[in-house]
Amino acid sequence: VHMNVNAIEVKAGNLESRLPLGLLLLTPLLFLLAVVLLPLWTMLQQTNADSFRMVWQDDYMRRLLDWTTLQAVISSGLTLLLGVPVAWAVTRLQFAGRSWVLRLLMLPFVMPTLVAGVGILALFGAQGILWRGWEGTPWLLLYGNVFFNLPVMVRAAYQGLCQVPATRLYAAQTLGAGVWQRFICVELPQMLPWLAGGVCMVFLYCFSGFGLALLLGGEHYITLEVQIYQLIAYELDMAQAGVLVLWTLATTFVAGIVYACLSKYTAQTALVQMLPPQIPTARQKLGLLLALLLLLGCCVLPLLAVGWRAVLAGSSWLVLLESTTWLALLNTLRFTLMAMVLALLLGFTHAALAQRLAWVRSLTFLPFMVSPVCVSFGLLLCYPGWTASLSMLVCTYALLAYPFITKDVLAAWDSLPHSYTQAARTLGASRIQVLLYVILPLLRPAMQRGVALAAATCVGEFAATLFLSRPEWQTLTTLIYHYLSTAGRDNYDRAMVLTLLLMLLAMLIFALLEWSKDKKRQSIC
C-alpha cells in the first residue's frame, strides 16, 4: 500500500510539473484561435445573402474579381517561365560570383513590398527614369509581382534541381540524351513538386498582395485587397467588404492547402549527390548572360533606381533630421522588437507542438493563407474595444512573422537524430535539461534565420499598420506612403530618401541572415 501511495505521488508530481509545459505548448493554438479564427467567424456573421447578391450583381465587383485572379495567374505563369531557365543556369553552370547570386536570391525575401513598389515607380512611374508610359496600365503591377516573386520561383526550381541524382543524368547522357532531352525526361519530372509549390506560393502572394497593388494598380487595376481597404476606410461598407474578404480567404485557403500538401512531400528530401556545376559552352554562356541580365533587370534594377533617385533628392535629405522621421523610425524598431519577442515564443512552441501532433504542422501555413488586410479587418470587428490598442497591432505583426520561425525551426528539428535526446535521457537528464542543453543549441542557427526573416517582415509591414495604427504610431512605411500620396516634387523626393533608409534596414537584416548561415557552416566544418 505504501508503494502504491508513493507511485501515485510521483505520477501526481510529474503531472503537476508537466502541466505548465503543456499549457505553454498550447499558446500558439490559443493565439491562432483569438487572432485568426474568432475574427474570421465575426466577419462571417457580418455578411448575409443580400450582400452576396449585391456583390455578384455589381459589374465593377465582378471585373475586380476577374482582374485579381487574372493578374495572379499571369504573374505565376511569368515567374514560372522566367524562373526555371534562370534556376537551371545558376544550378548547372559554373561562373564567377555564382555563390553571391545564390545569396542575392534571398534579398527580395527580406525587402519590404513598399520598397519594391517605390523602386518600380522610380523606373516607370510618372517621373520614371527609364520610361513614363506605364502609368495607368497593368504592366506596373505585373512587373512588381515578377520582381517580388521571381526569386521565390528560382529558389523553388533550384531546390528541385538539387534533388536530381547525378547518376540519372550520367545514365541519360550515356544513352545519348542531350541537355534538352535530359532536362525534359529526367530533371523536369523531379522538379515538378517544387515547381508546383512555388506556383502556389506566388499565386498566394499575388492574389492577396496589398502594398504593390495599392502603389502600382492605379485607379483601374487595383485588386480585392485594395478594394477591401477602400470599402472600410472610406465607405464604412462592412457587408460588401466582408463578402470580398470571404472570397479572398476561400481562394487563398485552397492554394494554401495545396502548398501545405506539396510541402510535406518536398520536406522529405534525401541527401543525393547532385551534378556539379559545369563549365558552360559558348551557347550556354549566352544563356547564362541572359539569365543574369534577367535577374538584374527584375530583382536589382528597382533597388538601384531608389538609390539613384535618393541621391538626386537634394534638400529633401533634410527629412532625415525631422522629428516625424525619427518617431517613425523609432516606432518601426520598437514594434518590430516587441513583435519578435512574441513571434519567437509562438514560433518555437508551435514547432515543439508540431513535433508531438502531426496535424499541428498544417497550421504552420495558416497565417500565410490569411492576408494582413483580412486579419486587420477581422480584428477590428471582433475586438472593437481594442481598436486603438498597441497590443492588437503587435499581435498582428507577430502573426505575420512567427511562421518563418516555425518553418525553419521545425525543419531543423526534424533533421536532429533521435539518438542525441535518447543518450541524454539515458544519462539522467530531464526533459527540460534535454531541451536547454541539447536541442536548443542545435536549433539556434535555424532560430536566427527565422528571426531575421520575421524581423524583415515586421520592418516592412504596411497593410496592418495602415489599418490599425494611430497617428502617433506612424512607421516608416506609412510615412513613405503619406509622402507618395501627397502632391509635390519635394514630397516625392522625401519618399525616395525614406525608402532608401527602409531598404538599408532590410539589407542590414539580410546581412545578419547571411552571417548566421556562414556561422553555421563554420560550426559544421
PLM feature spans:
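Transmembrane-helix boundary motif in ABC transporter permease subunits
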Residues: V73-L105, V118, A122, R168-L169, ...
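Glycine/proline-centered hinge or cleavage motifs at structural transition points of membrane proteins
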Residues: L175-A177, P189, L427-A429, P441
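C-terminal transmembrane helix and the adjacent membrane-cytosol boundary/short C-terminal tail
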Residues: N4-A7, L19-L24, L38-M43, A96-R98, ...
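Membrane-interfacial helix termini and adjacent extracytoplasmic/periplasmic loops
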Residues: D50-S51, R62, G97-W100, L114-V146, ...
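Interhelical loop and adjacent transmembrane-helix boundary motif
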Residues: R18, F52-M54, D59, F207, ...
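Membrane-cytosol interface at the C-terminal ends of specific transmembrane alpha-helices
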Residues: W134-Q173, V186, G197-V199, L390-R425, ...
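Periplasmic/extracellular loop-to-transmembrane helix junction in inner-membrane transport proteins
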Residues: V10-G22, W41-G77, R92-L93, I184-C185, ...
